[in-house]
């Protein structure tokens, strides 16, 4: 199986780190609104890679995140560290809590994920479930 390696900018034969075992992580939605057709393209491409790996006999540990906190509006202006949290902004817009907004749009996303017959990741990880690990990772990067 050949894939485009964005690091080397070359089409290369896929070679797993461990024989027939692949870890695959894809970014999932930020659940402050309905997912766009452009977002669905990303998830469909991830599904294509996942199914291709399975077809070629790989055991795939597939993980997708759900961002339910901390996605700031400043990334639209080129500064991801500024602006308002998208979930807080949506909560004000809808007159709900950020938790309610995240739950509603997560359910909508998962329902449509199934309607599109996309392969479910082995693990769905919500950002709020991994804040401690994220802080530790940033600390390591800053060293």
Task: Report residues per predicted region.
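NTP-dependent nucleotidyl-transfer catalytic core
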Residues: 1-143
């Amino acid at each position: 199986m050949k894939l485009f390696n964005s690091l080397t900018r070359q089409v290369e034969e896929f070679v797993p780190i461990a024989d027939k075992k692949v870890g695959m992580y894809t970014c999932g939605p930020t659940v402050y609104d309905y997912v766009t057709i452009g977002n669905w393209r990303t998830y469909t491409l991830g599904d294509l890679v996942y199914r291709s790996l399975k077809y070629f006999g790989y055991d795939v540990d597939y993980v997708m995140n759900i961002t339910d906190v901390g996605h700031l509006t400043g990334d639209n202006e080129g500064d991801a560290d500024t602006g308002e949290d998208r979930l807080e902004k949506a909560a004000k817009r809808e007159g709900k809590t950020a938790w309610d907004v995240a739950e509603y749009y997560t359910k909508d996303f998962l329902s449509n994920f199934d309607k599109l017959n996309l392969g479910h990741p082995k693990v769905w990880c919500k950002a709020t479930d991994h804040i401690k690990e994220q802080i530790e990772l940033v600390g390591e990067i800053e060293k």
